[in-house]
Amino acid sequence: MKNTIIYIDGGNLYYGQLRGSANKWLDLEAFSAKLLNPDHAIAAVKYFTSRVIDKSADQCHTQRQSQYLTALATRPLVKIIEGRYREQSELLAPVQEPCTSCDRKRADGRIKVRRITEKMTDVNIADAMLRDAYERRTECLVLISGDTDLAPIVKTVRYHVGIPVLVFNPQRSICNELRRYATFYRNIPQGSADGCRLPDSFETSDGRTIRCPAAWMPGRTGDS
């Protein structure tokens, strides 16, 4: 059995596999095991994510994410590593002429837009992979991401440290950079998360009850 650590790019997985599906209440341990051959013994699942900045008044998105992270924290193999989102305003030229009554339009035609970008996730993933590889904590690394920025760390771990790196890309498009350097590369088929749900309701060791958000219950779909 190969001692294996999983590194999951949470945002990449969400937009590639989970958005608009009924699989958001995902059991990361079960999902990871489903991707691998039986000769892998999963030692840890490291989940990299950032707390969302909710655009709605009722904060429903942040509440659901918080419930999910609380549920994940109870899983014995899962470790959550958080980055952050940065919000900033920019002035951009519209692709199409906006409504003339738009109060965000300036005299030069540009519009003030709100841009939210995730920070630190790729850095945190690269740091964790490099540390685990150099300290020989694992015999195999599995990256679940389609982010081209992670190609250099895949190359370093495979060719300079000498530990195999398997890449499972949640996106539909092929990432040639990751495929070039990975020991094994595969795009994850849509629907692969089916059947990998956490229990809809369960009690923790300290007596708390954790429930799946109503919007994420079986039969419900959408982007939230």
Where are these regions (language model features)?
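Domain-level signal for Mg2+-assisted phosphodiester chemistry and nucleotide/NA-binding surfaces
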Residues: M1-R104, R110-R114, H160-N169
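Nuclease catalytic cores that cleave nucleic-acid phosphodiester bonds
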Residues: E82-S224
